[in-house]
Amino acid sequence: MATVPEPTNEVMAYYSDENDLLFEADGPKQMKCCVQPLDLNSMGDGSIHLQISHQLYNKSLRRVVSVIVAVEKLQKIPCSQTFQDDGLRSIFSLIFEEEPVIFETYDDDLLCDAGVQSLTCKLQDRDQKSLVLASPCVLKALHLLARDVNREVVFCMSFVQGDESNDKIPVALGLKEKNLYLSCVMKGDRPTLQLEEVDPKTYPKWKMEKRFVFNKTEIKNSVEFESALYPNWYISTSQAEEKPIFLGRSKGGHDITDFTMEIISP
């Protein structure tokens, strides 16, 4: 079994402006510096003495020597009567090395790749009429018998980007398991509500086009859906039976703009 030779010690004064260690000529594997416990108060001349032995290089030793060199430099800094923040910063600058902090920015268009919060729900108007898909792109409001409740459409309500306030929440209303979303477009001189087919690979997304966005407002136990593209125009139903839903302006008037919402799953 190999035996470890006894280290031979000698004393030398140590000083370095560059905080470098002293190494053997053949590389950093063998090292000359070994720090022994120091009593700085006992050194009259204020110098730093290191005891030298042949030992393997250790990263922790480099840190210890760096701190000792920093202490040596501190001895040469004139002491002020009051310790201030600037003094503390100068001490830290001797011991720690600053590293740049890099902030990454992202394009808003990339946010569509992130998950969009949504819930599934059913809507009934104030007269308890349910919404059903009467044709591929037409929603109608009518009273359903118990045996026909499965005809009622289920909405996927997505929470999207918009002008959110304390009482208004921007949402998009899509039909569950269908590539159809309610949207608002101008036809002639009047905003019109329609079901628009979309690409399921792209929708829903956080940054929806404004025609798909409705500001949901809760009033007591009911909700209203105002078009974000056409303010003061609301998703409405007629008091007559089995009529298509539409965009109306007579809030609280003849047309019905308030709905009850049954949440199926958050």
Swiss-Prot record:
<dbReference type="GO" id="GO:0043123">
    <property type="term" value="P:positive regulation of canonical NF-kappaB signal transduction"/>
</dbReference>
<dbReference type="GO" id="GO:0070498">
    <property type="term" value="P:interleukin-1-mediated signaling pathway"/>
</dbReference>
<keyword id="KW-0202">Cytokine</keyword>
<dbReference type="GO" id="GO:0050995">
    <property type="term" value="P:negative regulation of lipid catabolic process"/>
</dbReference>
<keyword id="KW-0963">Cytoplasm</keyword>
<dbReference type="GO" id="GO:0010573">
    <property type="term" value="P:vascular endothelial growth factor production"/>
</dbReference>
<keyword id="KW-0458">Lysosome</keyword>
<feature type="site" description="Important for interaction with integrin">
    <location>
        <position position="168"/>
    </location>
</feature>
<keyword id="KW-0964">Secreted</keyword>
<dbReference type="GO" id="GO:0032729">
    <property type="term" value="P:positive regulation of type II interferon production"/>
</dbReference>
<dbReference type="GO" id="GO:0070374">
    <property type="term" value="P:positive regulation of ERK1 and ERK2 cascade"/>
</dbReference>
<dbReference type="Pfam" id="PF02394">
    <property type="entry name" value="IL1_propep"/>
</dbReference>
<dbReference type="GO" id="GO:0051044">
    <property type="term" value="P:positive regulation of membrane protein ectodomain proteolysis"/>
</dbReference>
<dbReference type="GO" id="GO:0045840">
    <property type="term" value="P:positive regulation of mitotic nuclear division"/>
</dbReference>
<feature type="site" description="Important for interaction with integrin">
    <location>
        <position position="187"/>
    </location>
</feature>
<dbReference type="GO" id="GO:0045917">
    <property type="term" value="P:positive regulation of complement activation"/>
</dbReference>
<dbReference type="GO" id="GO:0005764">
    <property type="term" value="C:lysosome"/>
</dbReference>
<dbReference type="GO" id="GO:0045766">
    <property type="term" value="P:positive regulation of angiogenesis"/>
</dbReference>
<dbReference type="GO" id="GO:1903140">
    <property type="term" value="P:regulation of establishment of endothelial barrier"/>
</dbReference>
<protein>
    <recommendedName>
        <fullName>Interleukin-1 beta</fullName>
    </recommendedName>
</protein>
<dbReference type="GO" id="GO:0071466">
    <property type="term" value="P:cellular response to xenobiotic stimulus"/>
</dbReference>
<dbReference type="GO" id="GO:0010641">
    <property type="term" value="P:positive regulation of platelet-derived growth factor receptor signaling pathway"/>
</dbReference>
<dbReference type="GO" id="GO:2000556">
    <property type="term" value="P:positive regulation of T-helper 1 cell cytokine production"/>
</dbReference>
<dbReference type="GO" id="GO:0071222">
    <property type="term" value="P:cellular response to lipopolysaccharide"/>
</dbReference>
<comment type="similarity">
    <text>Belongs to the IL-1 family.</text>
</comment>
<dbReference type="GO" id="GO:1901224">
    <property type="term" value="P:positive regulation of non-canonical NF-kappaB signal transduction"/>
</dbReference>
<dbReference type="GO" id="GO:0010575">
    <property type="term" value="P:positive regulation of vascular endothelial growth factor production"/>
</dbReference>
<dbReference type="GO" id="GO:0051781">
    <property type="term" value="P:positive regulation of cell division"/>
</dbReference>
<dbReference type="GO" id="GO:0006955">
    <property type="term" value="P:immune response"/>
</dbReference>
<dbReference type="GO" id="GO:0032757">
    <property type="term" value="P:positive regulation of interleukin-8 production"/>
</dbReference>
<dbReference type="GO" id="GO:0050729">
    <property type="term" value="P:positive regulation of inflammatory response"/>
</dbReference>
<dbReference type="GO" id="GO:2001240">
    <property type="term" value="P:negative regulation of extrinsic apoptotic signaling pathway in absence of ligand"/>
</dbReference>
<dbReference type="GO" id="GO:0008285">
    <property type="term" value="P:negative regulation of cell population proliferation"/>
</dbReference>
<dbReference type="GO" id="GO:0045429">
    <property type="term" value="P:positive regulation of nitric oxide biosynthetic process"/>
</dbReference>
<feature type="site" description="Important for interaction with integrin">
    <location>
        <position position="201"/>
    </location>
</feature>
<dbReference type="GO" id="GO:1903597">
    <property type="term" value="P:negative regulation of gap junction assembly"/>
</dbReference>
<dbReference type="GO" id="GO:0030213">
    <property type="term" value="P:hyaluronan biosynthetic process"/>
</dbReference>
<dbReference type="GO" id="GO:0005829">
    <property type="term" value="C:cytosol"/>
</dbReference>
<dbReference type="GO" id="GO:0001660">
    <property type="term" value="P:fever generation"/>
</dbReference>
<dbReference type="GO" id="GO:0005178">
    <property type="term" value="F:integrin binding"/>
</dbReference>
<dbReference type="GO" id="GO:0032743">
    <property type="term" value="P:positive regulation of interleukin-2 production"/>
</dbReference>
<dbReference type="GO" id="GO:0005615">
    <property type="term" value="C:extracellular space"/>
</dbReference>
